[in-house]
Amino acid sequence: LLSEVPADVDDDFFLEEEVTPRMFSFNSHVGACPRCDGLGELPGYHGETKCPDCGGERLKPGGRAVKISGLNISQFCRLNVCEARAELELWRLTRNERVIAEQPLREILTRLEFLESVGLDYLTLDQRSTTLSGGEAQRIRLASQIGSGLVGVMYVLDEPTIGLHPRDTDRLIRTLKRLRDLGNTIIVVEHDLEVIRQADHLLDVGPGAGHYGGMVVASGSPKQVEHKGSSITGKYLSGKKGIQIPEERRPVNSQRTIRVQGASQHNLKEVDVEFPLGVLTVVTGVSGSGKSSLVVDTLLRAAERRVSGKRVEVGTHREITGLEYVSQLMVIDHEPIGKTPRSNPATYSKVLDPIREVFAMMPESKARGFTKRRFSFNAAEGRCATCDGQGYHLIEMHFLSDVWIPCDACKGKRYNRETLAVTYRGQTIADVLGLEISQALELFEAQPRIRRILQTLQDVGLGYMKLGQAGHTFSGGEAQRIKLASELAKRSRGGTLYVLDEPTTGLHVDDVARLLKVLNRLVDEGSTVVVIEHNPEVIKTADWLVDLGPEGGVGGGRLLFSGTPEACAHCPDSHTGQFLAPLFGMAPGTVLSVPDSGAA
């Protein structure tokens, strides 16, 4: 578009050079600034610095000189989606210019409108892809397809609602239906009940996880699936099963809170907010409203600096008080528990330690002089010398994904022949690592220490998982639940602050119910749990709610409400409240006729 619309240029460059689209691309040698190769920044000892030649605009002088309505392409791309759409609507083009620009303008506006419709209006057009969440990146790719106008295409989306507030989920559903109505096929892998209810056809796979699943238990419309007794999803759709609103919420002690004052990291606008101790607090708000800036960049970093004594950079704020009540800090995220076969549920939960002790006490071990160390696949004495106890060999494929193949010597068992001669109730240490957690629970029913740890893994819904399953094969939700179970298995000391960022990502609603039981157990043991979440099933069970917004980006960053979920349902400015209201039998936006309970 810029290469085809006339512009006022001060120098004589364009008298000699033809204006082409590549002049406005920092990915092309024709347009990219030669000093920084189109990056806009130069590497330096103290980090990256703005390129002095292009001023961070990435382009050669010719590309920067062309302007429309006073903006060159780099300046235009600094606008967020909303601002860019408004700017385009202000452009005043002549009849000839409009003929030339009509098609590209239509495509630009279509894509911008879609990005806005799925809650990405707060993103700037030049935002780096490395800073985007998986859900944001997926919706941006979908925007490029919407603008293409293709028909007869099959689109496959894996949990497109990740990171989406219920308000934006509604928008996404409308967009997917729009794609369908153009003559395309949409296949979505999804756990969100609202998306499931809007499907034309539903395939429910199960009934359980791991080898307990893998079958199609129901197929048909959502209404038809509701009546399939074998479908857990159907039971939640019909209301036969559900996550209940607690009859009574934990009381908040105003004298025991972490108080954050003047938080202004990123788009936060001098936020003053309290996080009560000893309760389950959920932080809500549409995408980009400032939740991570408040909880992760400010609260979490400040707590980390106090607890660990490390020099941690904390988000901009005036003052934070109450951290003296926090003795431990734990972040439960979706990151893998390890990247090699050495990391597994047995090692991460530390249940392998007492299991090794049991094997060391067997008569065969005592006769051979074996100690607990003999049954560690990280120790040279007992492990397979060929694979060093990994059970697998790594084959690097360079341009393809690396491949792990079983060791020819031990056949994946990790240990040498002498170590495998020792058994407990007929099982070798390798056999134990090959057991599912539910099976291991039966095997070690007479061992209290082992049983307690295994029971917590079972309680979070991981009974199907093998004790020795490699950590790099877990989904994000599985990794998170292993971390939670490991925390639960520890002797309670209280005073721990747990921070979770969207823990329901990748979880079926039945798994969400299990997750909530675990979180509530942590709180009952004296800990404080702070969760960033969009899932209404989690939000409605919170003891305390902190809602930011009202929108994302520059339109957000304000504290809209803090208090109980019921009170939030009466807050007319809160998008979260509007979706909570029906759950409490209220009309959205109903004004509460009692004194203010924390709305800001």
Which ranges hold each PLM region?
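Conserved phosphate-binding elements of NTP-dependent enzyme cores
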Residues: 1-600
